[in-house]
Curated annotation (Swiss-Prot):
Changing residue 289 to F: In DFNA15; decreases subcellular localization in the nucleus; decreases DNA-binding activity; decreases transcriptional activity. Changing residue 164 to R: In DFNA15; uncertain significance. Acts as a transcriptional activator. Acts by binding to sequences related to the consensus octamer motif 5'-ATGCAAAT-3' in the regulatory regions of its target genes. Involved in the auditory system development, required for terminal differentiation of hair cells in the inner ear. Keywords: Activator, Cytoplasm, Deafness, Differentiation, Disease variant, DNA-binding, Homeobox, Non-syndromic deafness, Nucleus, Transcription, Transcription regulation. InterPro entries: HD (IPR001356), Homeobox_CS (IPR017970), Homeodomain-like_sf (IPR009057), Lambda_DNA-bd_dom_sf (IPR010982), POU (IPR013847), POU_dom (IPR000327), POU_domain_TF (IPR050255). This is POU domain, class 4, transcription factor 3. The gene is POU4F3. The lineage of its organism: Eukaryota, Metazoa, Chordata, Craniata, Vertebrata. Brain. Seems to be specific to the retina. Changing residue 328 to E: In DFNA15; decreases subcellular localization in the nucleus. PROSITE patterns: HOMEOBOX_1 (PS00027), HOMEOBOX_2 (PS50071), POU_1 (PS00035), POU_2 (PS00465), POU_3 (PS51179).
Length: 338
């Protein structure tokens, strides 16, 4: 009974001996005292309540120090190193400033936001650690959020003013892409026009493909007849059609110019044998060929070469003569039967 009635002094934390709103302590010291776990004494039954009041008062004092720190010089490096050692987990969102243009454009806003961002980052966890209720914890981010939005607006404005050239390439890209890509309808019209002009000039698709090498265009050689055919029938890929169009257009312009000027340029047509005259075989050579045909109507390639060399004729001429002679014999037999 005596023990219960006796007045025992409550165990007080050493922090209570110091004035609550002392202006002698810096913000970093206040944060250290709030974040460091204080030993819970068994004799103090109101310990947690006192600590929450103390933490709330010290947090308000720290915010007050920040507001007063705007008017007098402040060393951010000392606060940064001291606060980095505080074992508090940051749950608040900060806006990192990593662009040098923003710092040079608005130095006052950048330094002010950096200092307050550092302090508020460590203040908000202390409010949750010290045991404040949900309404107080949700009020602080609501008060801080407009400041961050304003700082972000200044940051984006500074970045836009410092780097106006970064917007220009993006606006110019669609124009470049439109120049590179060609309209499919234009390709179709050119393919049809090319086909009609080629036929009017009397040039085959194979002649066009072979004559492209004579244009002396860098990186362009002769093409096959199937490639020209696929271009005219629009069965090539879109990229190949775009790449082949200027080459065929250059050939067509030169071919039409040569045709108008009546200038003989066989390399454009690749037609040295395209317009050769009808071959006429003299009577002595013709009698010799008829004699060979009577012996062997289907001579081998080696035999045709030997006959051509002996009669001083081209091998192709001898081969075609034997082929025509066989067709003539078939017609004669067919007419005799019927």
């Amino acid at each position: 009974m005596m023990a219960m009635n006796s007045k025992q002094p409550f165990g007080m934390h050493p922090v209570l001996q110091e004035p609550k709103f002392s202006s002698l302590h810096s913000g970093s010291e206040a944060m250290r005292r709030v974040c460091l776990p204080a030993p819970q004494l068994q004799g103090n039954i109101f310990g947690s309540f006192d600590e929450s009041l103390l933490a709330r008062a010290e947090a308000l004092a720290a915010v007050d120090i920040v507001s007063h720190g705007k008017n007098h010089p402040f060393k951010p490096d000392a606060t940064y190193h001291t606060m980095s050692s505080v074992p508090c987990t940051s749950t608040s969102s900060t806006v990192p400033i990593s662009h040098p243009a923003a710092l040079t454009s608005h130095p006052h806003h950048a330094v002010h936001q950096g200092l307050e961002g550092d302090l508020l980052e460590h203040i908000s966890p202390t409010l949750s650690v010290s045991g404040l209720g949900a309404p107080e914890h949700s009020v602080m981010p609501a008060q801080i959020h407009p400041h961050h939005l304003g700082a972000m607006g200044h940051l984006h404005q500074a970045m836009g003013m410092s780097h106006p050239h970064t917007v220009a390439p993006h606006s110019a890209m669609p124009a470049c892409l439109s120049d590179v890509e060609s309209d499919p309808r234009e390709l179709e019209a050119f393919a049809e026009r090319f086909k009609q002009r080629r036929i009017k000039l009397g040039v085959t698709q194979a002649d066009v493909g072979a004559a492209l090498a004579n244009l002396k265009i860098p990186g362009v050689g002769s093409l096959s007849q199937s490639t020209i055919c696929r271009f005219e029938s629009l069965t090539l890929s879109h990229n190949n059609m775009i790449a082949l169009k200027p080459v065929l257009q250059a050939w067509l312009e030169e071919a039409e110019a040569a045709y108008r000027e009546k200038n003989s340029k066989p390399e454009l047509f690749n037609g040295s044998e395209r317009k050769r005259k009808r071959t006429s075989i003299a009577a002595p050579e013709k009698r010799s060929l008829e004699a060979y045909f009577a012996i062997q109507p289907r001579p081998s390639s080696e035999k045709i070469a030997a006959i051509a060399e002996k009669l001083d004729l081209k091998k192709n001429v001898v081969r075609v003569w034997f082929c025509n002679q066989r067709q003539k014999q078939k017609r004669m037999k067919y007419s005799a039967v019927h």
